From Swiss-Prot:
GO-annotated cellular components: host cell cytoplasm; host cell nucleus
Keywords, ordered alphabetically: Cap snatching, Endonuclease, Eukaryotic host gene expression shutoff by virus, Eukaryotic host transcription shutoff by virus, Host cytoplasm, Host gene expression shutoff by virus, Host nucleus, Host-virus interaction, Hydrolase, Inhibition of host RNA polymerase II by virus, Manganese, Metal-binding, Nuclease, Phosphoprotein
Gene field: PA
Localisation: Host cytoplasm; Host nucleus
Cofactor note: Binds 2 manganese ions per subunit.
Keyword Metal-binding: yes
Cofactor requirements of the protein: Mn(2+)
Annotated motif Nuclear localization signal 1 (NLS1), positions: 120-135
Residues that, per the record, bind Mn(2+) 2: 76, 104
Residues spanned by motif Nuclear localization signal 2 (NLS2): 180-243
Protein's UniProt name: Polymerase acidic protein
Class in the EC hierarchy, top level: hydrolase
Amino acid sequence: VRQCFNPMIVELAEKAMKEYGEDPKIETNKFAAICTHLEVCFMYSDFHFIDERSESIIVESGDPNALLKHRFEIIEGRDRTMAWTVVNSICNTTGVEKPKFLPDLYDYKENRFIEIGVTRREVHTYYLEKANKIKSEKTHIHIFSFTGEEMATKADYTLDEESRARIKTRLFTIRQEMASRGLWDSFRQSERGEETIEEKFEITGTMRRLADQSLPPNFSSLENFRTYVDGFEPNGCIEGKLSQMSKEVNARIEPFLKTTPRPLRLPDGPPCSQRSKFLLMDALKLSIEDPSHEGEGIPLYDAIKCMKTFFGWKEPNIVKPHEKGINPNYLLAWKQVLAELQDIENEEKIPKTKNMKKTSQLKWALGENMAPEKVDFEDCKDVSDLRQYDSDEPESRSLASWIQSEFNKACELTDSSWIELDEIGEDVAPIEHIASMRRNYFTAEVSHCRATEYIMKGVYINTALLNASCAAMDDFQLIPMISKCRTKEGRRKTNLYGFIIKGRSHLRNDTDVVNFVSMEFSLTDPRLEPHKWEKYCVLEIGDMLLRTAVGQVSRPMFLYVRTNGTSKIKMKWGMEMRRCLLQSLQQIESMIEAESSVKEKDMTKEFFENKSETWPIGESPKGVEEGSIGKVCRTLLAKSVFNSLYASPQLEGFSAESRKLLLIAQALRDNLEPGTFDLGGLYEAIEECLINDPWVLLNASWFNSFLAHALK
């Protein structure tokens, strides 16, 4: 296609497509259409001038000193902002009605905008589509076809015969050029209806009044404001920009020095509690190696098989009650699970899924019939004191040490591999050697990482829960929490962490909540850090024999039970937790790239194989922590995984706002003499997010360590 047009037109067409996020290499027909259209617009305007007597004349090679003005203003081929600026200024100076869509040309002789069309179909069809689309009496339409036909509004063709013949000849040449390269047939057939021109959205009525009322000071109308915004140059001196914006703003730029920043204030209050959807470092697995039982791979079969590996069950009792809940119900729920699993065993054929009986304890735990009754708005809009519930402010919590321990554990290696080599996904294109080498090195560093176990566990639980929520909306389905891995010797292993019982799940919207009760095995005694387990009721359900250096010891086995909830959108993201692998791989790649550009050769091999080199991992009160490249990979992965496990509005806000302060501090560290205004406001915005979320509080304390060291 490129060879059929001149380089300037090709460049403009590529720019136009990029602006709409389209790729000329892929959408070649569209690319050809845009090139053709641009060329016709330029030819339309070529050689046409207006002389000093305001007469329209044609000059092909004339006196360069003659006072001539171009007859046509070319709008097509400019970027959107610029194009609208031109249209606005034409309308302001000539009083012509402003078009809804960006036209192609403006004719200073006839004082009208022109819409040019080039079609591979019937000119009439295309003309009608254009007319229907722009719905404006004022804009003149002129359509050309590749077969030499044309059609224009009121049969007024604007230009002389010869100029139009030149355009038709060129179109015919383009057609031949494309045909000789085997492009024409596909191009001819690919034309779709009219859809690409951008609409100028007119605001009327109430919305218009609201818009006019909410303009910044010093703007008399929405139009003025639009024109100002279109012409706003984003770079330049800040003080100048601010004074340009408004007389009321007088931002004094304060220098940001080593002594300027203060640490973030972390909230006081009781220690924060665990809020993840499943247990992390405290989880305990019942496992089977080399599973080959009948129905292997069916979750319920696998779960029963795992349960049978344990012989230390005992009469359960509550060791740490839930402060607000009806604790006997949690106990009864676990007993019910055991009893119903036993019932399954006694049946001839084990079913593939198990729906729990709707007992009073499960109805209570799953919040059945607890939702306030929905009333049609029509029936209550006359109620005089209709208002939303007052919701309590969230209670402040202080940072507790358990969340740092959780993070450290997530960075550690386990003795099993949780992903296969291809888990990060093959590229569609034949991938260059370097990228696959990096991916393999990275996978080797993280495949045994505990954070990777959390990913696979999260993917499994969310997938199973979303499936059950759609397939068994009314049932209290029992969902085993399962993961699969390989041992050091490469043997397959299936693990059971516990069970989930799902509540009613008629999920219409993305944010509609499905309640569930989770019951998870653990060897952690909840009485050691009771604040961490505030939301749980913990039972003691058995004794487990553990092999230690001293011999076998018996340890009590606990069951952590809580009610919880999630939504379609959260489950969707949970199912996609493997993205964390990709995100951390990309962060590592950018480190390798930086290293490689300094050394001017690819450093992938050295990067991963030079075991002596240490890398900065993070800041702690002790200073900058360093570690091997593997440790860096696992730390980055753990951060990404925790961002997913502990996702929350507090985290979103903290990440966005603290990043600004981080950039300022880094600028100071690089001796760039940064300046700020309203630093107090920035601190407020950051600290507003420090309420009670364990992961956000931990990140804030890391941030304080960073500030302290960065500005020493």
